[in-house]
């Protein structure tokens, strides 16, 4: 790395720290990209830190293709665990484990931008190994699917049977469709709407 490249890296650091400080001050968290353990650890740490700093509301912006369900579970549970009220703002797409995180907030605090798309579906997993291990993993995926369907039914007000039928395959919803379905309370177009 030459001196010019090193200077560019050094110049980026204060902006990064300043941006993070501003996000902390504004009590905003961004969940962008795949859901994994690293993201879950970061988001849960941010939630605990913000809760320790104040009881003021927190905003989480979600734009995710989904990912690891258990990582999504940890964020979902932490949102419910902390004292401050959490608002979810969907943007881009809110899919799979991203939707699991999104519904951690009560319906009245679930918002989205107009072009947000939502995807609900059953969990998937790759299995290999001995037949008995594959059987165990299949049972666990079925239990996970039943649990996730129950969470979605409670969050949306839809009957469990409808959720199970809809999530049997990929179930896409526009912002307006998600509002009608009970995923979203309001579609917002500016920060002033929040």
UniProtKB/Swiss-Prot annotation:
Keywords: Cytoplasm, Hydrolase, Protease, Serine protease. It is an enzyme of class 3 (hydrolase). It catalyses: Hydrolysis of proteins to small peptides in the presence of ATP and magnesium. alpha-casein is the usual test substrate. In the absence of ATP, only oligopeptides shorter than five residues are hydrolyzed (such as succinyl-Leu-Tyr-|-NHMec, and Leu-Tyr-Leu-|-Tyr-Trp, in which cleavage of the -Tyr-|-Leu- and -Tyr-|-Trp bonds also occurs). It holds the Pfam family CLP_protease. It is found in: Cytoplasm. One of its GO terms (cellular component) is endopeptidase Clp complex. It comes from the Bacteria. The active site is at 96 (nucleophile), 121. Cleaves peptides in various proteins in a process that requires ATP hydrolysis. Has a chymotrypsin-like activity. Plays a major role in the degradation of misfolded proteins. This is ATP-dependent Clp protease proteolytic subunit 3. It comes from Rhizobium etli (strain ATCC 51251 / DSM 11541 / JCM 21823 / NBRC 15573 / CFN 42). The lineage of its organism: Bacteria, Pseudomonadati, Pseudomonadota, Alphaproteobacteria, Hyphomicrobiales.
């Amino acid at each position: 790395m030459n001196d010019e490249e090193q200077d560019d890296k050094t110049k980026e650091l204060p902006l990064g720290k300043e941006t993070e400080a501003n996000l902390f001050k504004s009590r905003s968290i961004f969940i962008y990209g795949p859901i994994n353990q690293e993201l879950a650890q970061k988001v849960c740490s941010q939630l605990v830190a913000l809760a320790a700093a104040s009881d003021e509301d927190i905003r989480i912006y979600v734009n995710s293709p989904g990912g690891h369900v258990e990582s999504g579970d940890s964020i979902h549970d932490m949102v419910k665990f902390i004292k401050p009220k959490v608002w979810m703002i969907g943007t881009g797409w809110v899919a799979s484990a991203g939707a699991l995180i999104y519904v951690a907030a009560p319906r009245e605090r679930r918002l989205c931008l107009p072009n947000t798309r939502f995807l609900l579906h059953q969990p998937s997993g790759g299995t290999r190994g001995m037949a008995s291990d594959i059987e165990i993993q299949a049972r666990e995926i079925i239990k996970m699917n039943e649990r996730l369907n129950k969470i979605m039914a409670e969050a949306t007000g839809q009957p469990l049977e409808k959720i199970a039928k809809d999530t049997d395959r990929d179930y896409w919803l526009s912002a307006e469709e998600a509002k009608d379905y009970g995923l979203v309370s309001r579609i917002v177009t500016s920060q002033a709407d929040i």
